[in-house]
Amino acid sequence: MTTDTQSLPAWLDKVRWDDNGLVPVIAQEAATNDVLMFAWMNREALAKTIETQRAVYYSRSRKRLWFKGEESGHVQHVHEVRLDCDEDVVLLKVEQVSGIACHTGRHSCFFQKFEGTVENGDWVAVEPVLKDPEHIYK
């Protein structure tokens, strides 16, 4: 399958892409149901994800495809791809290689938990750093 945007499959048209041609994506660990991260995909990224069974996102800052783990080795093997009821959010059920999904070296990007009250609360890191980011991105 080619991923030239002119020849992408018709099933991609069911997804409700935003004005920038992107759709939000949630990566969830298949074995534990832990929410690992949030990212974006364009049509090419979603097609590549289906084709390779590895998570491929679209980096808005780099304006290019981002093959999860291309620098860190922390790839996501895709077990299942789902589309929500409004057809505007994609869920990937993945196996997270090495257990690290976040660029901070943690298991999940959602490692900060709100504790306290509206008047006196704060975000607290509740997941440990599994690997120093300095050693992940050399």
Swiss-Prot record:
Say yes or no: keyword Mitochondrion present: no
User: Lipid metabolism among the record's keywords?
Assistant: no
The record's HAMAP family line, in alphabetical order, gives: HisI
- A molecular-function term among this protein's GO annotations: magnesium ion binding
Pathway of this protein?
Amino-acid biosynthesis; L-histidine biosynthesis; L-histidine from 5-phospho-alpha-D-ribose 1-diphosphate: step 3/9
Sites where the protein binds Mg(2+): 84, 86, 88
Q: Which SUPFAM superfamilies match?
A: HisI-like
Which cellular component, as a GO term, is one annotated location?
A: cytoplasm
Compartmental location: Cytoplasm
* Top-level lineage group: Bacteria
Q: Which residues bind Zn(2+)?
A: 85, 102, 109
- Keywords recorded for this protein, A-Z: Amino-acid biosynthesis, Cytoplasm, Histidine biosynthesis, Hydrolase, Magnesium, Metal-binding, Zinc
> Which species is this record about?
Burkholderia vietnamiensis (strain G4 / LMG 22486) (Burkholderia cepacia (strain R1808))
Protein name, UniProt field: Phosphoribosyl-AMP cyclohydrolase
Principal location: cytoplasm
Q: How is the cofactor bound?
A: Binds 1 Mg(2+) ion per subunit. Binds 1 zinc ion per subunit.
